Amino acid sequence: MAKQSMKAREVKRVALADKYFAKRAELKAIISDVNASDEERWNAVLKLQTLPRDSSPSRQRNRCRQTGRPHGFLRKFGLSRIKVREAAMRGEIPGLKKASW
């Protein structure tokens, strides 16, 4: 199990990314716009740097909903490989069965 503080940190990062998504997209559009003046682009870079680091979506980490485990995460289920296997063995995931050939 991951520490509660780690789970809370991830929740905070998701909230910040949602809050600043439009602002970040607007600034990045100005930065990548070739028609914008150099000064305008530089100001956009400086403004982007003032935003919180955790507002960047690339700082988010997928974690298991049950345990908070960051590795072995399966997006389809939102769980780690261990919890997916446990749920599959109990028959809690419809349509999922153990491979046999």
Swiss-Prot record:
Q: Which NCBIfam families match?
A: PRK08881.1
Tell me the Gene Ontology biological-process terms attached to this UniProt entry.
translation
Please give the HAMAP family that the UniProt record associates with this protein.
Answer: Ribosomal_uS14_1
Name by which UniProt lists this protein? Small ribosomal subunit protein uS14
Protein task = Binds 16S rRNA, required for the assembly of 30S particles and may also be responsible for determining the conformation of the 16S rRNA at the A site.
- GO cellular component labels: cytoplasm; small ribosomal subunit
Q: Which superkingdom heads the taxonomic lineage of this protein's source?
A: Bacteria
**Keyword terms of this UniProt record:** Ribonucleoprotein, Ribosomal protein, RNA-binding, rRNA-binding
Q: What PANTHER family does the annotation carry?
A: 30S RIBOSOMAL PROTEIN S14 (PTHR19836), SMALL RIBOSOMAL SUBUNIT PROTEIN US14M (PTHR19836:SF19)
What's a Gene Ontology MF term here?
A: rRNA binding
Subunit structure of this chain's protein: Part of the 30S ribosomal subunit. Contacts proteins S3 and S10.
Q: Which InterPro entries match?
A: Ribosomal_uS14, Ribosomal_uS14_bac/plastid, Ribosomal_uS14_CS
- Name the family the entry cites: Belongs to the universal ribosomal protein uS14 family.
Pfam families from the entry?
Ribosomal_S14
